[in-house]
Amino acid sequence: MKALYMVFVLWVLIGCFLRCKERMGSEEKQAQEDPGDQDL
């Protein structure tokens, strides 16, 4: 159970980190105004 709890906590932290990174990236893209820079 402890391992599952640690995996869950890591998953939440990674999710928040990726979300923050995505938000920062979208702000940078808006500042550059380059619509042809999205290949996700």
UniProtKB/Swiss-Prot annotation:
Its main location: secreted. GO terms for biological process: response to toxic substance. InterPro entries: SMR-like. Keywords: Detoxification, Secreted, Signal. It is found in: Secreted. GO terms for cellular component: extracellular region. It comes from the Eukaryota. Residues 1-20 form the signal peptide. May play a role in protection or detoxification. This is Submaxillary gland androgen-regulated protein 2, isoform epsilon. It comes from Mus musculus.
